A protein has these predicted regions:
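Bacterial N-terminal signal peptides
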Residues: 15-24
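Bacterial N-terminal signal peptides that target proteins for export
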Residues: 5-15
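Short linear motifs in intrinsically disordered/low-complexity regions
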Residues: 6-7, 23, 300-302
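Alpha/propeptide regions of enzymes that mature by internal proteolysis
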Residues: 29-329
Length: 329
């Protein structure tokens, strides 16, 4: 009798474990969402009108990107869409809103990564590409390479008929004024003092696939040819299924040295840290070496994190577990 009771109890325990595991898998599969950022820096000088413009753009982009995921679309499509929307706006330092280098030329960078197989594509120092993020995805899908730069990337864009524009498309009197101001102050912290920044997105789709994408015009008054963390896989962008997706913004040289995006996922994977702890601790540690910036992240359960150590960071999120959220400070 005791033996039969023991067997029954063991069978019930096994059944309970199976049901718990199945529920966990179902919950994970049903989780989806997207997080975006529009850059970190000194944002306190933004006018109320400008703040409203930015918040409205972020909100509209989140709603549309969320709809892609809700309808069963891929995380890759969602992050590419979100970043390209920001590239088409003059509100952010990417695409049309890109800042000038010291030669009064815009040089843009972008990268995208698929967490399902860790495939990635990136472009750097491109000057005539309307949407660098779209070209980055084409590098991923249509070449055997990860990163194309400058003229080589632009030739590839022409070959595949990606949208090419005249440099006048990126002209901005406001950004020229900022360049002149930057030349006068000769500061290493231009990217932090700028009032607009790098853009990025991370997403989890219904199939459990995570993707990340980042794009930028770089640092005002940067040396021609300077490339920051944005197109560097592991620094500005990282996506890894079953762990997390990360997009960075800030002082790119430090983010490259510390492999910030990948470090978040590494701490989760090997130290069993939560998304919030891993991402927040890294941003705090960067502050100790006077490295300014922020990150956005999403994990396999659609938990999100958006820490920063600057005056503000344009950011927002929308998941099936949480309401639409948009903030600057």
């Amino acid at each position: 009798m005791l033996g039969q009771d023991y067997q029954i109890r063991m069978k019930l325990k096994i059944l309970f474990l199976i049901l718990t595991l199945n529920m966990s898998l179902i919950t994970s599969a049903e989780s989806f969402g997207i997080v975006v950022h529009g850059g970190a820096g000194v944002l306190s000088g933004l006018s109320i009108e400008r703040q409203q413009e930015i918040e409205n753009k972020v909100k509209d982009t989140l709603i549309s990107a969320y709809k892609i995921l809700e309808d069963g679309g891929s995380s890759m499509d969602a992050v590419e869409f979100a970043v390209s929307e920001f590239e088409d706006s003059t509100l952010f330092n990417a695409g049309k809103g890109s800042v000038y280098n010291s030669d009064e030329v815009q040089e843009m960078d972008a990268s995208i990564m698929n967490g399902a197989d860790r495939s990635a594509g990136a472009v750097a120092s491109v000057q005539i590409i309307k949407n660098p993020i779209k070209l980055a995805r084409k590098v991923l899908e249509e070449t055997d390479h990860v990163l194309l730069v400058g003229r080589g990337a632009e030739i590839f864009a022409k070959d595949i008929e990606e949208t090419i524009v005249d440099r006048s498309y990126f002209h901005s009197e406001k950004n020229l004024k900022r360049l002149k101001k930057a030349k006068k102050r000769i500061s290493d912290n231009n990217i932090i003092e700028d009032k607009i920044g790098t853009v990025g997105a991370v997403a989890l789709d219904k199939n459990g696939n995570i993707a990340a994408a980042t794009a930028t015009g770089g640092m005002t008054n940067k040396m021609p040819g300077r490339v920051g963390d944005t197109p560097i896989i592991g620094s500005g962008t990282w996506a890894q299924n079953d762990v997390c997706g990360v997009s960075s913004t800030g002082h790119g040289e430090f983010f490259i040295k510390y492999q910030v995006a990948k470090e978040v996922c590494t701490r989760i994977e090997y130290l069993n840290e939560t998304l919030e702890k891993a991402s927040s601790d890294i941003i705090k540690e960067l502050l100790k070496i006077d490295a300014r910036g922020g990150i956005i992240a999403i994990d396999k359960n659609a938990n999100t994190s958006m820490p920063f150590n600057t005056d503000g960071m344009i950011r927002g999120s929308f998941t099936n577990k949480s309401e639409l959220f948009v903030a600057i400070y």
